[in-house]
């Protein structure tokens, strides 16, 4: 039911083109995944989202458990039917949100107890419970429950988080029973190379359908992100999709692809769009700026999104300045289209074996400067 096939390699880097088959369709990799935390990418319908070229969307177990609850989603026929999305879905376990957002009362080897931010009640979440919730939600891919240490953290604290993550992965694997849902493990280890190597080896030993690299983009220097990805990716199974969590800038995506990463997700494109910022030609454009007031050209002549095909910079400026919701939707659609087109262009370059030349300006040793 799940299959990952590699169709092309770059002859100069570890970049590859693949196809990840799921019960709800295929995901062509490398591929950026929009984030629909609460079963929606904010301000965008499922039909509009499909028009951006999105093939797989991420939703969040923590937030959906709090509201509306996995029972309601299951009664609706699962997350796909609940949100009207018939393509692949992935649910994050909620571990990152719990350790970064929630008011933690207790964390131990059994699990975590935290305060519900909506009503103040106590909630206990264990690896088993996290998997039960994700099985009820019914996404194509469920993520193992892990402990994501903050940055900075001491080596001893990161090592303890790794041991807990590995023990929890075993419990997640034992609990997960669905054949129509793939379980992905998560590599942790902070910025410590030996802990990353150890975690990669342990997670790979579970022989799961896919593996993610977690605990990056949590405040560490970008150079550490590059180093971690370059170190960990070659340690993961060649025949499984590799997912780099929380990465959504062009440079970071290009660098990660060169290291052999296949999947990415990030709230950046939609968050920027909701704040009036468009991603154009490697730059961030603030559409509130007066320079767009009388500019009747599209944001990007080559872009296929609704905003660029039907509207001008002046109109988008007008919408954003007047806080019209349509402006936020149009910019979110544009930004998502830009990210997805970028990964599609990378894919074509790998197939043509010109990735290392065409995307050299995005690599860390390039003098070219890109703001996103």
Swiss-Prot record:
Cofactor(s) the record lists: Zn(2+)
Key word tRNA-binding present: no
EC number, UniProt record: 2.4.2.29
Keywords (A to Z) from UniProt: Glycosyltransferase, Metal-binding, Queuosine biosynthesis, Transferase, tRNA processing, Zinc
Enzyme class: transferase
GO biological process annotation, one example: tRNA-guanine transglycosylation
Taxonomy, superkingdom: Bacteria
Cellular component, GO, one term: cytosol
UniProt binding sites for substrate: 92-96, 146, 188, 215
Residues reported to bind Zn(2+): 303, 305, 308, 334
Region (RNA binding) residue spans: 246-252, 270-274
GO MF term set: metal ion binding; tRNA-guanosine(34) queuine transglycosylase activity
Pathway linked to the protein: tRNA modification; tRNA-queuosine biosynthesis
Disulfide bonds: none
Catalytic activity: 7-aminomethyl-7-carbaguanine + guanosine(34) in tRNA = 7-aminomethyl-7-carbaguanosine(34) in tRNA + guanine
Residue positions of the active site: 92 (proton acceptor), 265 (nucleophile)
Signal sequence bounds: none
Complexes and interactors: Homodimer. Within each dimer, one monomer is responsible for RNA recognition and catalysis, while the other monomer binds to the replacement base PreQ1.
PANTHER family linked to this entry: QUEUINE TRNA-RIBOSYLTRANSFERASE
Name of the molecule in the record: Queuine tRNA-ribosyltransferase
Organism taxonomic ancestry: Bacteria, Bacillati, Cyanobacteriota, Cyanophyceae, Synechococcales
Primary gene name: tgt
């Amino acid at each position: 039911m799940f299959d990952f096939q590699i169709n092309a390699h770059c002859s100069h880097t570890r970049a590859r083109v693949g196809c990840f088959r799921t019960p709800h369709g295929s995901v062509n990799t490398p591929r950026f995944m929009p984030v629909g935390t609460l079963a929606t990418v904010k301000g965008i319908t499922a039909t509009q989202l499909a028009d951006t070229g999105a093939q797989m969307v991420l939703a969040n177990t923590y937030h959906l458990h709090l509201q509306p609850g996995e029972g309601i989603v299951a009664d609706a026929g699962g997350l796909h039917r609940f949100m009207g999305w018939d393509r692949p879905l992935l649910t994050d376990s909620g571990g990152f949100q719990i350790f970064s957002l929630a008011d933690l009362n207790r964390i131990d080897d059994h699990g975590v107890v935290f305060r519900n931010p909506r009503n103040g009640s106590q909630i206990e979440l264990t690896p088993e419970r996290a998997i039960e919730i994700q099985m009820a939600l019914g996404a194509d891919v469920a993520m193992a429950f892990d402990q994501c240490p903050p940055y900075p953290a001491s080596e001893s604290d990161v090592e303890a988080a790794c041991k807990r993550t590995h023990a929890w992965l075993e419990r997640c694997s034992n609990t997960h029973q669905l054949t129509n849902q793939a379980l992905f493990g998560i590599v942790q280890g902070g910025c410590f190379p030996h802990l990353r190597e150890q975690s990669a080896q342990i997670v790979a030993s579970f022989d799961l359908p896919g593996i993610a690299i977690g605990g990056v983009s949590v405040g560490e220097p970008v150079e550490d992100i590059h180093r971690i990805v370059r170190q960990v990716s070659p340690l993961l199974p060649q025949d499984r999709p590799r997912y780099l969590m929380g990465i959504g800038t062009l440079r970071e995506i290009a660098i990660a692809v060169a290291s052999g990463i296949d999947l990415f997700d990030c709230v950046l494109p939609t968050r920027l769009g909701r704040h009036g910022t468009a991603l154009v030609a490697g730059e961030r454009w603030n559409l509130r700026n007066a320079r767009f007031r009388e500019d009747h050209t599209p944001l990007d002549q080559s872009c296929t999104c609704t905003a660029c095909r039907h509207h001008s910079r002046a109109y988008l400026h007008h919408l954003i300045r007047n806080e019209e919701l349509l402006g936020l939707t149009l910019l979110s659609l544009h930004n998502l289209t830009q990210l997805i087109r970028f990964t599609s262009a990378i894919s074509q370059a790998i197939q043509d074996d010109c990735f290392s030349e065409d995307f050299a300006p995005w690599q860390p040793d390039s003098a070219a400067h890109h703001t996103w």
